């Protein structure tokens, strides 16, 4: 069954596979066991995530203070730009926000940032995430996302399966530290 789903996804160019929270936690905690200051004072970029659904965004926002992060940046890819189209529906989080734009929600990616206690409750966490629409669709190869890549100290994500090699080259080009959590089969993927 799982192979059938992956084969269908490959043929349809559906790269929407969300990484489980516990898999992210297990991987990241291994880095912290080795060096508790791995993320201290660092800007983390999550460039291949839908921040409203991503467990990467949730995990790092919930652990922002614990890890001593400087800044968290999470970006998404616009629904209209995806090769695999599904019946996109904005979340209540987005539609209830004053900046919601019916056209931008499908044409533009989103950027979520976290770097301060926006709510004034004395802690920095998921409730302090701020968001806006990107100028473009959120493609990691765009100048807009490259600028964020260059700002980041560490890039962490589960990149689109079909773009794994391009994504890895994109990181290496900028000489950035990175953590890729995903299938070991991604490295062998060919069109």
What are these regions (language model features)?
Residues 1-191:
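Class I S-adenosyl-L-methionine-dependent methyltransferase catalytic core
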């Amino acid at each position: 069954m799982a192979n059938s789903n992956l084969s269908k996804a490959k043929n349809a160019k559906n790269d929407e596979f969300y990484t489980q929270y516990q898999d992210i936690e297990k991987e990241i905690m291994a880095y912290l066991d080795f060096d508790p200051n791995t993320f201290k004072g660092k800007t983390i970029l999550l460039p291949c995530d839908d921040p409203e659904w991503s467990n990467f965004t949730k995990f790092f926002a919930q652990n922002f203070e614990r890890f001593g992060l400087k800044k968290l940046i999470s970006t998404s890819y616009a629904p209209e730009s995806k090769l695999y189209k599904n019946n996109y529906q904005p979340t209540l989080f987005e539609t209830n926000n004053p900046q919601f734009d019916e056209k931008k929600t499908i044409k533009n990616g989103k950027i979520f940032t976290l770097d301060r206690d926006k709510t004034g409750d004395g802690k920095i966490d998921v409730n302090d995430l701020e968001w806006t629409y990107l100028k473009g669709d959120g493609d990691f190869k765009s100048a807009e996302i490259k600028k964020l890549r260059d700002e980041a100290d560490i890039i962490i994500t589960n990149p689109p399966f079909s773009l794994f090699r391009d994504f890895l080259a994109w990181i290496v080009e900028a000489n950035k530290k990175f953590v890729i959590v995903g299938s070991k089969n991604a490295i062998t993927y060919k069109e």
